């Protein structure tokens, strides 16, 4: 039975599982879903599944609900390890008529304590319900590289695609920076960082902030069916979005509640 843990001016937090939470979203009401589900790597009791097929079947069930809940121009981000998300994409990606873009979250501040290639990235599927979808490029522009900063103006070749079909004698960098790329270089959270909680798979606020800025507008509804420590909800509230989140673990719901109370 779902339990309301917190109700705020912009949204509500629930102790419930993902399917129950998504069922609360009317058809087409969510502009954005950010999902950081269990990775099926047995990191904790809630991360254990009988088999990879069982995990993919489960993901397909809640992604069907995500598709229903999304607005016609809405999208969803799903976090995970590449080897697992490849299976999820193959099964569930076909639901999304706008296609699936594969993003990479890259971090360089995690020590390699094993005897193999050290993991320094995770993947994020960007699932688009339709070909026309919200993408606020200017909100998530990034700094230009060293070469562009050193030589900010240059002659534009006749064949250049940078002008969007408009011929210009010279190209100048955009004042807000370069367009975003599909590799996001953001440090992972480490002990001692202010935002760090006891959640084992907590995502950095900066990572989620970019996703929310890129794929939603002010007052849009942002949904997180695996809210964990509440990062998506905290970021959404700060950015003026409405939000709905839940988690099946009461300890994590408590973490999220405390963070939201400190933010709201």
Language-model regions: role of each:
Residues 1-255:
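Core catalytic lobe of class I
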Residues 214, 259-262:
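Active-site catalytic microenvironments for nucleophilic, acid-base chemistry
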Residues 252, 261-264:
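Conserved phosphoryl-transfer catalytic core
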